[in-house]
């Protein structure tokens, strides 16, 4: 992996902050709604910036519509951000949906479900150490019939 230059990283951080402000305050497009800028990767030559965003929507179609609205507004957003940053050349902005937040929430929910299931089985059978495979199979069978 190539060495990351501190200037590229600093510009990425500043670009992330400025994009967050512009998207929150200056964008009036109702299709976009509330968007979070998670990360910005700037190319070494500063010609491109890949902007990772998330929305508080889980429906894939709605997320795609919002992402398309952002992509369509990218030149305008670039102009607004260029006015706020002191760069000779403003990177071309490319928006990418970051599903890591949604996946993290999904994984957290799955872990919570497993913990709750374990607690229910512990209450039903007593100590977890006393539970045998047959007890678990029987509990699964009775849950399936209910």
UniProtKB/Swiss-Prot annotation:
Query: Which residue intervals are annotated with compositional bias (Acidic residues) in the record?
Result: 130-146
Q: Which GO terms describe its cellular component?
A: cytosol
| UniProt keyword annotations, A-Z | Cytoplasm, Ribosome biogenesis
Q: Where in the cell is it found?
A: Cytoplasm
Record PROSITE patterns = RBFA
Annotated spans, Disordered? 122-146
Q: Name one GO molecular function term.
A: ribosomal small subunit binding
Q: Which residues cross the membrane?
A: none
Give the matching Pfam families.
Answer: RBFA
Complexes and interactors = Monomer. Binds 30S ribosomal subunits, but not 50S ribosomal subunits or 70S ribosomes.
> What the protein does?
One of several proteins that assist in the late maturation steps of the functional core of the 30S ribosomal subunit. Associates with free 30S ribosomal subunits (but not with 30S subunits that are part of 70S ribosomes or polysomes). Required for efficient processing of 16S rRNA. May interact with the 5'-terminal helix region of 16S rRNA.
Matching entries from PANTHER family are given as: RIBOSOME-BINDING FACTOR A, CHLOROPLASTIC-RELATED (PTHR33515:SF1)
The name under which this protein is listed is Ribosome-binding factor A
User: What species was this sequence derived from?
Assistant: Shewanella sp. (strain MR-7)
